[in-house]
Regions:
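Carbohydrate-associated surface elements
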Residues: 23, 44
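A short helix/loop element that forms part of the nucleotide-sugar donor recognition site in Leloir-type
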Residues: 51-67
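A conserved mid-protein helix/loop that constitutes part of the nucleotide-sugar donor-binding site
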Residues: 72, 76-95, 112-118, 202
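Nucleotide-activated donor-binding/catalytic signature segment of Leloir-type glycosyltransferases, i.e.
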Residues: 118-136
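Short alpha-helical donor nucleotide-sugar binding micro-motif in glycosyltransferases
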Residues: 135-136, 144-149
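Aromatic "clamp/platform" in nucleotide-sugar-dependent glycosyltransferases that forms part
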Residues: 157
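Short hydrophobic beta-strand element within catalytic cores of glycosyltransferases
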Residues: 174-177
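Conserved acidic donor-binding segment of nucleotide-sugar-dependent glycosyltransferases
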Residues: 189-190, 194-201, 210-215
Length: 255
């Protein structure tokens, strides 16, 4: 109740506003901000450097997850808070685990829902199917995570333009995410990933199973996401957009 009025008051005193997504720009316009005052600059990450990773054996050993070459691995890297929809990920895992044994699940992250997640796993006898690896701070481990899982997921109820998806894209990891915030601007459904409605664990399970079963689609989505992100959401693309906007602002002020 305090945050919104204070920010609205501050934003109205600026001549130009930079929004991280078109969705956020539209939200500001609905609140009365003029469209010409708002420019969109997407988050970007570095695509120019070769990523360091551990070998597969070391990665799985470090997160205490048994590795089986005959299985697919589906992951989520998120803070364990309600807004991240980790409960939806767990519901999806149960749906799949109840009918097949060739897909396991990995959760990276800590948070207030840790015990709730543990209780769900134990209560549904998923201890050997869903693995909670905790918080990972080593960037090489995170690169390895996106390299060695088969499907990356994001189940949030609210997001802006999440780096977790861009990091997965950089490793050509196929992705299933909720269609919230700026995510539909990042992922083209059916081309560079799969989008589902927030809270829909059944749709999430269907997409995950499809990608695990169809290697050609999974690989194609990962490559397409990589190419799209490299072109539009790299740190260089972000810098170029900043430059163009600043040049436009300077030109306007010179008049």
């Amino acid at each position: 109740m305090i945050y919104t009025p204070i920010n609205a008051f501050a934003l109205r005193r600026y001549k130009h506003i930079l929004a991280v997504t078109k969705a956020f720009k539209y939200m500001l316009m609905l609140r009365g901000f003029k469209e010409e005052r708002i420019d969109v600059i997407y988050n970007g990450i570095d695509f120019s450097q070769e990523l360091q990773t551990y070998d597969m054996y070391t990665f799985f050993k470090n997160i205490n997850v048994p590795h089986d070459l005959n299985k697919k691995y589906v992951g989520i890297a998120a803070r364990l808070f309600a807004v991240k929809g980790v409960n939806v990920f767990l519901d999806m895992a149960k749906i799949i685990a109840d009918k097949r044994e060739d897909i396991d699940f990995i959760i990276l992250g800590n948070g207030e829902m840790w015990q709730q997640c543990q209780d769900f796993i134990k209560g549904n006898k998923l201890e050997n199917r869903v693995y909670m690896a905790g918080q990972v701070t080593d960037p090489v481990m995170m690169n390895s995570y996106y390299k060695y899982i088969d499907v990356n997921t994001l189940t949030s109820y609210s997001e802006s333009f999440p780096y977790a998806l861009l990091e997965g894209a950089r490793c050509k990891c196929a992705t299933v995410a909720t269609a919230v915030g700026g995510i539909p601007e990042m992922i083209i459904d059916g081309e560079s990933g799969c989008l589902v409605q927030s809270g829909d664990s059944k749709a999430l399970a269907e997409c995950v199973e499809m990608l695990c079963d169809k290697d050609d689609i999974r690989i194609r989505y990962g490559v397409n996401f990589y190419e799209r992100a490299k072109e539009n959401f790299s740190s260089q693309a972000m810098a170029n957009t900043h430059k163009k906007i600043y040049e436009k602002i300077i030109k306007e002020n010179v008049k």
